[in-house]
Design a protein with these regions (language model features):
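RecA-like P-loop NTPase motor core of helicase/translocase proteins
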Residues: 1-217
Length: 217
């Protein structure tokens, strides 16, 4: 049959040579277990930031399949001398911050765009179907300085891109459910949420065990 016909017969849709569209590079490397996939991912962050994104201080979201792996990866990326950390410090020196979701609001607004920021999280944290993990998409007053800083920089033009994203704006239903009354003045405006803040920075995304991750979205 050939690979194209065999693919179509197996999955019921045409084979696409550009898996993620014409504007997204797609390279597949087969690496055995223990072959150094994670250290390659660490080296990929500065390479992609420069060659593809053309930025000197990227934001990278590093997603892992479990909390145990999140803790291991976080420790490695934060430990001086560890190969994962060394791959990043070689490129960024001390202008580097590695953090978890709960620490994002503690990074000062001016640091975004000046230091490389690597956010380590579980894939489950961004699954919108899981009500217990929806803090990523919730309105958070702790991000007020960040969104007000973005608003002040260009009169809010930068925030306009969020209007095209799903689940990014405060709705009338959100305001009705809000017992504090804070959201009444934000209906139709972007949520002060972690998901929106990350979207503004168009992060690189590293997905550990991506071959075991799938979505209907």
């Amino acid at each position: 049959q050939g690979p194209v016909q065999a693919f179509g017969a197996l999955v019921g849709r045409p084979y696409r040579a550009d898996a993620f569209g014409p504007d997204v590079p797609c390279v597949c490397l087969r690496i055995p277990t223990g072959g150094g996939k994670t250290v390659m991912a660490a080296h990929a962050v500065p390479l992609l930031a420069r060659a593809w994104c053309n930025v000197d201080a990227p934001v990278a979201v590093w997603l892992v399949p479990s909390d145990a792996i999140r803790q291991q990866t976080l420790k490695a990326l934060q430990t001086p001398g560890h190969p994962y950390r060394a791959a990043l410090t070689t490129a960024y020196g001390e202008a580097l911050q590695v953090c978890v979701l709960d620490e994002v609001a503690q990074i000062a607004p001016p640091d975004w765009g000046r230091t490389a920021i690597v956010l380590v999280a579980t894939i489950q944290s961004f699954r919108i179907e899981d009500a217990g993990q929806r803090n990523v998409y919730s309105f958070s007053e702790s991000l007020e300085p960040h969104f007000k800083s973005a608003q002040a920089q260009d009169g809010g033009r930068r925030l306009q891109c969020l209007h095209a994203l799903p689940d990014a704006l405060v709705t009338a239903e959100d305001a009705a459910r809000d017992r504090t009354g804070v959201l009444q003045g934000f209906v139709g405006q972007p949520r002060w949420s972690l998901a929106n803040w990350l979207a503004l920075h168009r992060p690189l995304v590293i997905v550990d065990e991506a071959h075991n991750t799938k979505t209907d979205k």
